[in-house]
């Protein structure tokens, strides 16, 4: 294979999956085949999409009810020749799912890139090992927290929040994705002030924390803004990838003048991936494509919290981010939303140690503030790695957290 293989979930009311697959393969490549003269067929053969797999799935009554018709469900795979497209994500996505995405009854499940095609993508600049080296933390999950309630607040409020989270033992603190450039907390001021706070905490407590600042602005201003952030001392760039596009992420990741990790936020991605019947699968969108395009971290809904993904999907995202690949470094999985200390054993059991545990309210909502919330999580992480049940840990911060949010992991064993 020198091109790309697309895997689709299709729904066909004519009950002929093979015919539907062939129509897609032709429609996204040469347009027609059987009516072409033999000589023209020979000339266009190397450009034709080839159906390489058709698998019928069991009938699904809920799907029939939703579509208001009886359909045959199936998984199909089509190989698209590399000759047909340039080696970039806009061309690849338009080739494999462009006008087909308007069908409303087809879901792009996966894209399998040839080795030749992979060479055109950067992958993470730092990856898991590089991030761990920055923090000098190699033996446990990382802990991340979020600034909360920053809109309309000044830089002093940001510094107080950042200090409390860092003292609590948080490894990474990230901006809220809805904090944009503003007069009260402009980009470079956040970075410079944040570095002063984090250096002070490091000198006092010996704990290193990184700050992920939100990269925002018009698309053609992003590189300049990113370079300003780097010059100001930014540790990590948070980026709302799907508000801009995967190719924009790749452009940032490939720029040698932006030598910092990039954290991909999933905002807007639900518009592409939420439906089970159409769109793009979450594992492909938030896993494989983000990693290929250069994200060092990928945030996605956890299977446990307030905006939950199905566990199978969340684990598939993580698999794409962390599986061995000779072309790409591994990206950090960041299962998010509604996470509190009682979920830590679940997260470690399901995602392993190479994961970032991301909490907002689970840290800020602690009765002892963000310092207590961070310490509760760190204690829960240590106990989990020792295979010690959380309710047996003698720690006031963890005990308070479990009283407030519960201990759903009571029986979990690694």
Curated annotation (Swiss-Prot):
Description of how the protein assembles with itself and partners? Homodimer.
Transmembrane regions = none
Q: Per the annotation, how and in what number is the cofactor bound? A: Binds 1 Mg(2+) ion per subunit.
Concerning SUPFAM superfamilies, the annotation shows: RuBisCo, C-terminal domain (SSF51649), RuBisCO, large subunit, small (N-terminal) domain (SSF54966)
**Binding-site residues for Mg(2+), renumbered to this chain:** 174, 176-177
The name this protein carries in UniProt is 2,3-diketo-5-methylthiopentyl-1-phosphate enolase
- List, alphabetically, the PANTHER family matched: RIBULOSE BISPHOSPHATE CARBOXYLASE (PTHR42704), RIBULOSE BISPHOSPHATE CARBOXYLASE LARGE CHAIN (PTHR42704:SF17)
Per its record, what are the GO molecular function terms? 2,3-diketo-5-methylthiopentyl-1-phosphate enolase activity; magnesium ion binding; ribulose-bisphosphate carboxylase activity
- This protein's pathway: Amino-acid biosynthesis; L-methionine biosynthesis via salvage pathway; L-methionine from S-methyl-5-thio-alpha-D-ribose 1-phosphate: step 3/6
Which EC class heads this enzyme's classification? Answer: isomerase
Q: Which cofactor is recorded for it? A: Mg(2+)
Native source organism of the sequence? Bacillus cereus (strain B4264)
């Amino acid at each position: 294979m020198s091109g790309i293989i697309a895997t689709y979930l299709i729904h066909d009311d004519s009950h002929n999956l093979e015919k539907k697959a062939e129509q897609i393969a032709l429609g996204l490549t040469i347009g027609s085949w059987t009516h072409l003269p033999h000589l023209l067929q020979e000339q266009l053969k190397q450009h034709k999409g080839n159906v390489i797999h058709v698998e019928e799935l069991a009938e699904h009554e809920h799907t029939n009810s939703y579509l208001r018709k009886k359909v045959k469900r199936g998984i199909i795979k089509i190989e698209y020749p590399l000759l047909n497209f340039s080696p970039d994500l806009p061309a690849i996505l338009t080739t494999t799912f462009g006008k087909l995405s308007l069908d409303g009854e087809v879901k792009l499940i996966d894209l399998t890139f040839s080795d030749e095609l992979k060479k055109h993508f950067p992958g993470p600049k730092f990856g898991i090992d590089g991030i761990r080296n920055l923090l000098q933390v190699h033996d446990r999950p990382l802990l991340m927290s979020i600034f909360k309630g920053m809109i309309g607040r000044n830089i002093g409020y940001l510094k107080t929040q950042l200090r409390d989270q860092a003292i609590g033992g948080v490894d990474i603190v990230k901006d809220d994705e809805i904090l944009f450039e503003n007069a009260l907390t402009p980009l470079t001021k956040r970075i410079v002030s944040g570095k002063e706070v984090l250096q002070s905490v490091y000198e006092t407590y010996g704990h290193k924390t990184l700050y992920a600042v939100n990269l925002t602005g018009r698309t053609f201003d992003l590189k300049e803004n990113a370079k300003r952030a780097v010059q100001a001392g930014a540790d990590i760039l948070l980026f709302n990838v799907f508000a801009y596009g995967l190719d924009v992420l790749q452009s940032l990741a490939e720029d040698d003048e932006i030598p910092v990790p990039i954290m991909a936020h999933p905002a807007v991605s639900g518009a592409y991936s939420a439906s089970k019947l159409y769109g793009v699968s979450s594992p492909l969108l938030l896993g494989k494509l983000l990693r290929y395009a250069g994200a060092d971290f990928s945030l996605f809904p956890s299977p446990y919290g307030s905006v939950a993904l199905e566990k199978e999907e969340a684990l598939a995202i993580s698999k794409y981010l962390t599986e061995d690949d000779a072309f790409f470094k591994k990206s950090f999985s960041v299962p998010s939303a509604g996470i509190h200390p009682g979920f830590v054993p679940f997260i470690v059991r399901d995602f392993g140690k190479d994961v970032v545990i991301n909490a907002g309210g689970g840290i800020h909502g602690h009765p002892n503030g963000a310092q207590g919330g961070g310490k509760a999580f760190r204690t829960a992480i240590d106990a989990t790695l020792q295979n010690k049940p959380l309710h047996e840990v003698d720690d006031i911060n963890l005990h308070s957290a479990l009283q407030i949010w519960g201990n759903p992991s009571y029986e979990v064993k690694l």
